[in-house]
Amino acid sequence: MDTRVKTATLFDLRSWSAGCLDRVERALERWVTAEAPAGLDHGAPAELVEAMRYAVLDGGKRLRPLLVLAACKAVQGNEGAAMRAACATELIHAYSLVHDDMPCMDNDILRRGKPTVHVKFGEATALLAGDALQALAFELLTPEDATFPAAMQAQLCRLLARAAGSAGMAGGQAIDLASVGERLSERQLRDMHELKTG
């Protein structure tokens, strides 16, 4: 009788992440383009589309999409729906960075070593690009040809809206802006950062 323990195949996080990141990049490239089925084929001005693409396709760690795809893998969920949700979270993140960098917020001129969207395209286009990225995120969660029920689509939209809205990221940013020059307790800082990260 063979008493040796068979070694289970270990999950290769690095390989899995690289594959997911490649798929996320391709999906973002497909959905944030002038030919995209998710709404940008309606004659969006070229500069707006260019600003949106600049904001989203400029790299980044893509941690949020990886977390969504990891959750999908853990529960053996629908990979197509998960990719849409993964990209939606990245679009929300990108829109928040575009707005956060603007002069009325943090007035950053560089992001990831490149001029911020408002520096490259102007404030008005940056604001609209951020707004359009946010709208596109919700559109990705509600495809016309969805293989998952409308009630689930609505629930996903509700969750994302809460995480990004006044009870989440936007609320945290409002606290951040209101507290400039103020001394915050560790608890207040923690609460603000928890809200800002959705």
Q: Where are the model-predicted features located?
A:
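Conserved N-terminal diphosphate/IPP-binding helix and adjacent helical/loop segment
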Residues: 1-88, 92, 98, 105-106, ...
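Alpha-helical membrane-inserting segments
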Residues: 28, 95, 137-141
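A general secondary-structure boundary signal
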Residues: 34-35, 140, 144
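All-alpha helical catalytic cores of prenyl diphosphate-utilizing isoprenoid enzymes
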Residues: 42, 59-61, 124-131, 135-136, ...
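Active-site alpha-helical segments that house and flank conserved acidic catalytic motifs
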Residues: 82-105, 158-172, 197-198
